[in-house]
């Protein structure tokens, strides 16, 4: 650990790295506080900050030659086969680590790789290459299975722990597996942190963007007080401030043959209202809507909009245009509503729910991977990041208030490389609740802009798509009726 005075140059470097955001670190008293320039306190500067050679320091860090925590079960024959771009990442990592060892720098690297790149298999290859006992830390148990499958394929001795850390510590007294896969809440236990700091050399933080290391979290405390010898952050959407804890980044662009389309499903609704809606509208401008909780609650009870989403999904699914669908909502009650309605239409053999409150959901996710046709309804919290269903070909985004990082992660669920190349996203900028009309339009436009400008989607109007599709159930007369309704509504505003 390095306790340093917050001199101007150090503060400026940290500020630059976080894009001007406030910086919070542990001070010499162990308090997690916002750093102010010229502070009289000394601060605990994270080890990973010095992994970049651009950071000048006289500090010397230990290298792997001082430890003996080696994997005993490696079989080179079992090393996973990588694509050329994945091999390029491995080559970059090995080259960077040689330089780090030569310069006595911490072996900390962020793998900033696109959704669908294959971060998990690439990291498993690196793990086997290093031959060091490894901790794989995931934000939730849904991600456990994909790691388990690949670690087993590599043939490494491993153990999974998702529940009580106390019982795990008892087991570790008699056995110390080469690879330990845990959920991040285990890091709240100091005894466990001390154990892995002593007995494991490599720490892999999967989906590192899900942790805000400017908050006093278990992961923040672990990296500050029990820094591992080697560390990988894995993410497609890195948080700028997290660079303070892992300051060397490898990012390799991935060209894709996928045909990605985002359909804007617009419509013109008559104003819709209920007592419940009128009650929630009163809260839109209050402090209780600071994070747009009531905005999303209003969307969840916007019956005309919900019906439009269902009609669009049913039409596309029945036509065979899309086959493996992910439906995403912000709120659980919104998810349950869509699930029940779709279940009535298509039955339990086709419609599934990704409910965080159901312990069997991870097993259900595994079971649907091999299905040719299914509809999976879930929440942004549960399935917006890390959902491992590579065969997904379409996404219905039913919510609107989503930040850029969540948007990119969510769209990444349908950007996995498979033999089928068509990927389709549907967004719904219209609402029948006039008080949130412009707000919803602006939020959905942000989704559209990011998908087109950054992720290579092509924007198309769903109405034009229907008109050009001879199999569409939307008749010319119904389209004309909508146009007339639009004109009538505009004249009577």
UniProtKB/Swiss-Prot annotation:
Keywords: ATP-binding, DNA-binding, Helicase, Hydrolase, Late protein, Nucleotide-binding, Transcription, Virion. It is found in: Virion. Residues 100-256 form the Helicase ATP-binding domain. GO terms for cellular component: virion component. Its main location: virion. It is an enzyme of class 3 (hydrolase). Its EC number is 3.6.4.-. The keyword Transcription applies. Residues 309-456 form the Helicase C-terminal domain. The keyword Kinase does not apply. A motif (DESH box) lies at residues 206-209. ATP binds at residues 113-120. SUPFAM superfamilies: P-loop containing nucleoside triphosphate hydrolases. One of its GO terms (molecular function) is DNA binding. Belongs to the helicase family. Poxviruses subfamily. PANTHER family: ATP-DEPENDENT HELICASE IRC3-RELATED (PTHR47396:SF1), TYPE I RESTRICTION ENZYME ECOKI R PROTEIN (PTHR47396). Interacts with G2. Might be part of a transcription complex composed at least of G2, A18, and H5. DNA helicase which seems to act as a postreplicative transcription termination factor. Involved in ATP-dependent release of nascent RNA. Forms a stable complex with single-stranded DNA, and to a lesser extent RNA. This is Transcript termination protein A18.
């Amino acid at each position: 650990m390095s306790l340093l005075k917050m001199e101007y140059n150090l503060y400026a470097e940290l500020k630059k790295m976080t894009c001007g955001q406030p910086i919070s670190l542990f001070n010499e008293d162990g308090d997690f506080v916002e750093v102010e320039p010229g502070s009289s306190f000394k601060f605990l500067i994270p080890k990973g900050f010095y992994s970049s050679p651009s950071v000048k320091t006289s500090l010397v860090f230990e290298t792997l030659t001082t430890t003996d925590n080696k994997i005993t079960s490696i079989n080179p024959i079992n090393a996973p086969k990588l694509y050329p771009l994945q091999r390029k990442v491995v080559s970059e990592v090995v080259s960077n680590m040689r330089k780090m060892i030569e310069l006595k720098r911490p072996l900390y690297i962020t793998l900033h790789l696109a959704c669908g790149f294959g971060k998990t298999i690439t990291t498993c290859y690196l793990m086997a290459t290093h031959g060091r006992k490894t901790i794989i830390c995931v934000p939730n148990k849904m991600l456990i299975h994909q790691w388990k499958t690949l670690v087993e394929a590599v043939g490494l001795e491993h153990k999974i722990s998702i529940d009580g850390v106390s019982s795990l510590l008892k087991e570790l007294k008699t056995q110390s597996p080469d690879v330990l896969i845990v959920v991040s809440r285990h890091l709240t236990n100091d005894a466990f942190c001390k154990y892995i700091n002593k007995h494991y050399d490599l720490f892999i933080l999967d989906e590192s963007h899900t942790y805000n290391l400017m908050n006093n979290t278990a992961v923040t405390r672990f990296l500050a007080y029990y820094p591992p010898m080697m560390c990988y952050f894995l993410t497609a959407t890195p948080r700028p401030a997290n660079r303070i804890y892992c300051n060397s980044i490898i990012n390799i662009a991935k060209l894709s043959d996928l045909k990605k389309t985002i359909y804007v499903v617009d419509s013109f609704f008559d104003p819709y209202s209920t007592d419940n809606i009128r009650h929630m509208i009163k809260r839109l401008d209050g402090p209780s809507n600071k994070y747009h909780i009531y905005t999303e609650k209003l969307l969840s009870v916007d019956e005309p909009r919900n019906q439009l989403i269902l009609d669009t999904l049913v039409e596309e699914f029945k036509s065979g245009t899309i086959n493996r669908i992910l439906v995403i909502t912000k709120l659980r009650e919104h998810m349950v509503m869509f699930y029940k309605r779709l279940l009535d239409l298509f039955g339990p053999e086709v419609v599934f729910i990704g409910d965080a409150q159901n312990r069997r959901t991870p097993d259900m996710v595994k079971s649907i991977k091999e299905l040719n046709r299914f509809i999976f309804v879930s929440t942004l919290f549960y399935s917006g990041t890390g959902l491992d269903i590579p065969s997904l070909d379409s996404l219905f985004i039913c919510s609107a208030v989503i930040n850029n990082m969540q948007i990119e992660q969510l769209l990444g669920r349908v950007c996995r490389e498979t033999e089928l190349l068509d990927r389709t996203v549907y967004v719904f900028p219209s609402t029948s609740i006039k008080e949130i009309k412009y707000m919803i339009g602006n939020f959905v436009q942000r989704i559209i802009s990011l998908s087109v400008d950054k992720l290579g989607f092509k924007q198309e109007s769903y109405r034009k798509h229907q008109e050009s599709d001879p199999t569409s159930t939307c008749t010319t007369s119904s389209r004309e009726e909508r146009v007339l309704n639009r004109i009538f509504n505009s004249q009577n505003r």
